[in-house]
Amino acid sequence: MFKTINKSITSILLFMISFYQKWFSPFFGPRCRFIPSCSSYGYEAITRHGPWKGGWLTLRRLSRCHPLTPCGCDPVPD
């Protein structure tokens, strides 16, 4: 049952990120200070690590993405 819940949450989160990338991101233009972009990072983190750890990694990344942070490469950890 827990695996089913994880798969459902993963699907919902990935859909939300894909929806953002397709419908909202083109209007805002490139704003992320990191490579890969925050939405790509979130998609990869959730795909690799599941909804809980991947979601936490994504939230940490989003909290670091602001004008006072230096730009750079920030890949998803293994």
UniProtKB/Swiss-Prot annotation:
Give the protein name, as stated in the record: Putative membrane protein insertion efficiency factor
**Keyword Electron transport attributed:** no
Record keyword Cell inner membrane present: yes
Family designation: Belongs to the UPF0161 family.
Where it sits in the cell: the answer is:
Cell inner membrane
User: Which InterPro entries is this protein grouped with?
Assistant: Membr_insert_effic_factor_YidD (IPR002696)
The protein's role, per its UniProt record: Could be involved in insertion of integral membrane proteins into the membrane.
**Which UniProt keywords are listed?**
Cell inner membrane, Cell membrane, Membrane
GO CC annotation: what is one?
plasma membrane
- Provide the topology term for how it sits in the membrane: Peripheral membrane protein
| PANTHER family the record matches | MEMBRANE PROTEIN INSERTION EFFICIENCY FACTOR-RELATED (PTHR33383:SF1)
